[in-house]
Amino acid sequence: MFAHTLFRKRCAIWLLAIGIFLMLGSCAEKPSELERIKEEGVLRVITRNSPSTYFQDRNGEAGFEYELVKRFASTLGVELQIETADNIDDIFSRLNRPGGPALAAAGLVASEGRQELARFTRSYLDVTTQVVYHSGQRRPTSPKDLIGKRILVLKGSSQAEKLASLQVEYPELRYDESDAVEVVDLLRMVDEGQIDLTLVESNEMSMNQVYFSNIRAGFDVGEQNSLAWVVAKGEDDSLLKAADAFLEQAQQNGTLQRLRERYYGHVDVLGYVGAYAFAKHLQQRLPRYEKAFRETAKEHGIDWRLLAAIGYQESHWQPEATSKTGVRGLMMLTLRTANAMGVTNRLDPVQSIQGGGKYLVQVHASLPESIEEPDRTWFALAAYNVGGGHLEDARKLAEAEGLDPNKWLDVKQMLPRLSQKQWYSKTRYGYARGGEPVHFVANIRRYYDILTWVTQPQMEGQQLAKSELHIPGINSTDLMEELPPL
């Protein structure tokens, strides 16, 4: 009897222990969003397909948002998986859907109206909303000037929110929204006169303005806006905190500054007149020499559009160009460089292009191994213009100032000092017109961007007759920028 009672007590204790164990197991906290991402090894991100956010070219994936969020995924130790949304509303819908992407990195304004849809990280870029109009029309300077105009903006955008707010004060104001277009389409429609006005953020206007010779910025609407990443609504803030910490570190360690320089640091160098002239020369001059650019680039393993951009900066693709200093030809080679590259006739455009391509590759290869891409390409262009010795002087000046001698963003600040006695007197190679290579590189980067946009990715070596140029505003097929591999 005693043994039976003891057995029953032990069974009760075991059952109680099992119950407590099961209860604790059921009450155990689920892994946080951040822990789940790390366990799965993948960060799923939704974005927009546009030149300021994310795009794919022959070199792979690129874009300001893409590069920034890729670095974030790397700090988490996970792979990045990109999804593209059909429109802005689609971003928020999929973000809040069970099993949807964890983060949106799409150049989104952290507007008041969107706070109800999701949660925003700290800002990583400040922009303003600009009214864009056709240069042939009167410039709008205030909200009153929007009344009676054909206005189209992205559906669900912060620009639509601002127009809705203006409508309260100006009931006569009318506008349309569309989820079937992107920013580039809106700018093209203004450029072609299909609509009178649109509203876009200043960073997208700056990046795209050079492709459309007829668009201008009228006035800013409202206060400055903050671009931020977005996570779904909820109480789990683990991913949000991790993203905030990353963006703060990116601001402190220069990552954001370098990305801004890469994608926005050279966007305003041409101006309206320069952009129009370049578009005209694309159609009238480049076709004569495109085959030579392509063949030379293929021989040396470089992007033909980079070589063509150098040619335009040097001579505007004029084979008989001559400067006061004696440099001649389409690639404006000095006699010394021409001889070294085996060029016997600098006025022969094919020889000039071949010599310029060969020289660029040699300059690129001669740079210190510590300089990595994309900076290495910009350094090579600067050395192509001012010479390797002067470039090395500027690198040493940068190092002396506590800057990074391997970053173009830092060294380009030092190059203009080579024309100032207090600085060049301390260098090995002395005086140089140091401001010139800075402008040289900036211009070539912009020409290269445009060439990348307006040419379809084709197999190198195709016949010139099969090549097609697509000028934004004339044709509808546009490409995004890519960095030139050397």
Swiss-Prot record:
Q: How does it sit in the membrane?
A: Peripheral membrane protein
This protein's GO cellular component annotations are: cell outer membrane
What's the source species for this entry? Stutzerimonas stutzeri (strain A1501)
Region described as LT domain: 268-486
Extract the ranges annotated as region (Non-LT domain).
Answer: 29-267
Residues at the catalytic site: 314
Q: What biological function has been recorded for the protein in this entry?
A: Murein-degrading enzyme that degrades murein glycan strands and insoluble, high-molecular weight murein sacculi, with the concomitant formation of a 1,6-anhydromuramoyl product. Lytic transglycosylases (LTs) play an integral role in the metabolism of the peptidoglycan (PG) sacculus. Their lytic action creates space within the PG sacculus to allow for its expansion as well as for the insertion of various structures such as secretion systems and flagella.
Where does the protein principally reside?
membrane
Q: What is known of its domains?
A: The N-terminal domain does not have lytic activity and probably modulates enzymatic activity. The C-terminal domain is the catalytic active domain.
Where is it localised? Cell outer membrane
Question: What are the boundaries of the signal sequence?
Answer: 1-28
Q: Which domain of life is it from?
A: Bacteria
Name assigned to this protein: Membrane-bound lytic murein transglycosylase F
